[in-house]
Curated annotation (Swiss-Prot):
GO cellular component terms, semicolon-separated: cytosol
Binding site for Zn(2+): C400, C403, C416, C421
Residue ranges constituting the BRCT domain according to the UniProt record: 577-658
UniProt protein name: DNA ligase
Its biological purpose: DNA ligase that catalyzes the formation of phosphodiester linkages between 5'-phosphoryl and 3'-hydroxyl groups in double-stranded DNA using NAD as a coenzyme and as the energy source for the reaction. It is essential for DNA replication and repair of damaged DNA.
InterPro entries hit by this protein: BRCT_dom, BRCT_dom_sf, DNA_ligase, DNA_ligase_AS, DNA_ligase_CS, DNAligase_adenylation, DNAligase_N, Hlx-hairpin-Hlx_DNA-bd_motif
Gene: ligA
NCBIfam families per UniProt: dnlj (TIGR00575), PRK07956.1 (NF005932)
Record EC number: 6.5.1.2
Cofactor: Mg(2+); Mn(2+)
Classification via PANTHER family: CHROMOSOME TRANSMISSION FIDELITY FACTOR 18 (PTHR23389), DNA LIGASE (PTHR23389:SF9)
Organism annotation: Helicobacter pylori (strain G27)
Matching Gene3D superfamilies: 5' to 3' exonuclease, C-terminal subdomain, BRCT domain, DNA ligase/mRNA capping enzyme, Helix hairpin bin, Nucleic acid-binding proteins
Length: 658
């Protein structure tokens, strides 16, 4: 349960990271069930606190951002995501919202295939483009690869412009054969059929896609000029053009029929040719669909009725610890192999040591393992009645399994704070160069990856020893680009002290805390625990993190400070802040703006403003976008100055000119 706006913003960041890995990297970090639970908690918080909703929330957007591997291509009509329902009562509530106004509505029910959504554009009967869903507005152009999918027609008997949409999948049988080939060739195995389908569709070599035996199963249309009366009629038309028909498609009239259809699919799930993770329910009558419309993310006339997670019993035979990029330690259980949904499972996440203790999970326990959404397994609970005396307590590690440094143990999470830990180095450097840290132009994720691969850097100190010939070894680097990056790295020397503190990436210490620390001078990190606790806004966890971080990285920090020679203050920034109309003002942003609220918040904070989430008599300015809601009324009640986006931009521009 999310209890504060801080937890809400952290949840958004975490879910967006999970989505990036799932959609863009073909990598599932958590199970579908865990993601769904976290997502539903986010959604519940937003329903109770609509004024806090952020534009970058996963509830406000669809799918993924297109990567750089393929050209971006816009859809003629947006591709939407579906809202999920998880049980009979949620389905009943969803149906009632529709049937209350449209009692004659019927529903098309079909299997929800776990694959990659694809949009096919036909003009004058010819396939002209194939684009992945991406963020719903644009995706990756994969036309050449799509043409190698056997059941995608290159020509259809329809002369108008039409977008035909569906799911790219690989059958269970072909998935098993593909993984056997990869095993024999000493290549890494695909985790599941969805990852295999996604990776195969996004190959730079179309010949590889051709060998993967992908299939395209249509589920709808985008832009077209046909006059269908029903969704079922639309699907029948697609099949008449030469596309594959959807198996187990039914037209249902009420809740009882839908439930019967759903449970039939669950029974048939194991023998189905491809992996399923639910049933799609769509209002059949297109006039009702039109009247129901859409939310910001999804159609109101359709939903996905998710399948219950799959469980099996097995035994924990060992535990290993993995180190994440942030330094977080994740315990992973080694299991006696067990087959779930056609996959042999021998590992499952234990999430964190707090959860192990809470669930009383022990080594040699027989446990319930769940593989929801046919993806990553996790341990639900131990079966304590099977304990035979061989069980042992799973102990929290005291040192990092990678670098052997002492770990920071908090109530829930355990962290490696050693900046030189190989598992942390890359992410630490990405943060070091970021906009809110040293802001090194041109030093992004991909460049840092290459620098590591070429063994040119190990930590931040190595950046300042790079030479022109070093950078010329990197992909797509010529003399001008290499020199520009070297200049940017050198320019980052003599930074404001707060920027260098923030660049260190200390757990719980963000931009605001870094600015507070900078007020205490260049030796601030050497202060004692008692001295830190006296600082305004510094709690026990922040202080413990600071003290432990400095203890683990003293030599590195001293060398970095000596090399970069940070300034006690940034006169340019201070001058801009003090001359700003927003300096020391409390500001609230609300409504839909042309840029993410966080971007405006960052600009205003740089001008000395304090950004809060709620309007009160102490608020100085309310910045309003479209659909400002109750905060605007409250601002007027308290006599708060209200600026629209255009007025804000004018003031910001004027400050820039000064």
């Amino acid at each position: 349960m999310i209890k504060s706006q801080k937890e809400y913003l952290e949840r958004i960041a975490y879910l967006n990271t999970l989505s990036h890995h799932y959609y863009n990297l073909d990598e599932s970090i958590v199970s579908d069930a865990v993601y769904d639970e976290l997502y539903q908690e986010l959604k519940a918080y937003e329903e109770k606190n609509p004024n806090d909703i952020q534009a970058n929330s996963p509830t406000q957007k669809v799918g993924a951002t297109a990567t750089n591997s393929f050209n971006k291509n816009p859809h003629l009509m947006r591709m939407w995501s579906l809202d999920d329902v998880f049980n009979q009562s949620e389905l009943q509530a969803w149906l009632q919202r529709i049937l209350k106004t449209y009692p004659s509505a019927s529903f098309v029910c079909s299997p929800k295939l776990d694959g990659v959504s694809l949009n096919l554009l036909y003009q004058h009967g010819k396939l002209v483009s194939a684009t992945t869903r991406g963020n719903g507005l644009e995706g990756e152009l994969v036309t050449n690869n799509a043409k190698h999918i056997a059941n995608i027609p290159h020509f259809i008997a329809y002369d108008g412009e039409i977008e035909i949409r569906g799911e790219v999948i690989i059958s269970k049988e072909d998935f098993d054969a593909l993984n056997k080939e990869r095993l024999n060739a000493n290549e890494p195995l695909f985790a599941n059929p969805r990852n295999a389908a996604s990776g195969s569709l996004r190959q730079l070599d179309s010949e590889i896609t051709k060998k993967r035996k992908l299939q395209f199963i249509p589920w709808g249309v985008g832009k077209h000029s046909l006059n269908f009366l029903s969704f079922k009629e639309c699907l029948d038309f697609i099949v008449s053009l030469g596309f594959s028909a959807i198996q187990y498609l039914n037209l249902n009239k009420n809740h009882q029929e839908i439930e019967e259809n759903y449970h039939t699919l669950i029974r048939e799930r194991e023998g189905f040719f491809a992996l399923l993770d639910g049933m799609v329910i769509v209002v059949n009558e297109l006039n009702i669909q039109k009247e129901l419309g859409y939310t910001q993310k999804s159609p109101k006339f359709a939903c996905a009725y998710k399948f219950p997670a799959l469980e099996k019993h097995t035994k924990i035979v060992g535990v290993i610890n993995q180190v994440g990029r942030s330094g977080a330690i994740t315990p992973v259980a080694l299991l006696e192999p067990v087959e779930i949904a056609g996959a042999m499972i021998n590992r499952a996440t234990l999430h964190n040591y707090s959860e192990i203790e809470k669930k009383n999970i022990m080594l040699n326990d027989k446990v319930v393992v769940i593989r929801s959404g046919d993806v990553i397994p996790k341990i639900i609970k131990p079966l304590e009645t099977y304990r035979d005396g061989s069980q042992q307590k799973i102990m929290r590690p005291k040192v990092c399994p990678i670098c052997s440094h002492e770990l920071l143990c908090e109530e829930i999470f355990t962290y490696c704070q050693n900046l030189n830990c190989p598992a942390r180095l890359k992410e630490s450097l990405i943060h070091f160069a970021s906009k809110d840290a040293l802001n090194i132009q041109g030093l992004g994720d991909k460049v840092i990856e290459q620098l590591f691969e070429e063994k040119l850097i190990v930590n931040a100190l190595d950046l300042y020893a790079l030479k022109l010939e070093d950078l010329m070894r990197l992909d797509k680097f010529k003399i001008k680009k290499a020199q520009n990056l070297l200049d940017a790295i050198q320019k980052s020397k003599n930074p404001p002290l707060w920027r260098l503190i923030n660049a260190l990436g200390i757990e719980h210490i963000g931009k605001g805390a870094s600015k507070t620390l900078a007020k205490y001078g260049l030796n601030v990190l050497e202060k004692s625990e008692a001295e830190f606790l006296e600082m305004e806004g510094f709690g026990v966890e922040m202080v413990r993190s600071l003290v432990n971080f400095y203890a683990s990285n003293q030599e590195f920090i001293r060398s970095l400070f000596e090399l970069l020679n940070p300034k006690n203050s940034d006169m340019a920034e201070e001058k801009q802040e003090s001359s700003s109309v927003f300096n020391n003002k409390t500001i609230v942003l609300t409504g839909t703006l042309s840029k993410p609220r966080q971007e405006y918040a960052q600009m205003l904070e740089n001008l000395g403003a304090k950004i809060t989430s709620s309007v009160s008599a102490k608020t100085d300015f309310l910045i309003v976008g479209e659909n400002a809601g109750s905060k605007l009324a409250l601002a007027k009640k308290h006599g708060v100055s209200v600026l629209n986006e255009e007025e804000l931009l004018k003031r910001l521009k004027k400050l820039d000119q000064n």
